[in-house]
């Protein structure tokens, strides 16, 4: 359930945004065409419509890249486009699969700052194998091991035995 303005309701499809670890964008379109298409088909639900170039600037997508085909974008640029449509849609729940995988240092830092800015007013859930990233960005951490979820107390993360437990779980997962 989601609670808005004191009213509890069921989660709807439009409440959820998703960013894949391997960006999935229509590679036959330019960045501008894709963004325009997204804005046009979602015009009724976009709360704060702005000119396309403002959206691109918010994600640090250079003017010379905006009219290139998405197939010519780097992994990081495609990831930015996925994030951008979710920023525009403003879902209540944002699901991110390994959001910093394969990103260069600059884009990864931009994404971390963006994720920090998106925390207010929504639920952001992401998967990661990077413990430091979880520590940096998350209010709560949950470990998935053997199909079971276990809440991780941040205070335990300084405990050597607890770190060993997490590393052992990750090793088992990589051999499964």
Where do the language-model regions lie?
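Q-loop/switch helix immediately C-terminal to the Walker
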Residues: 22, 28-42
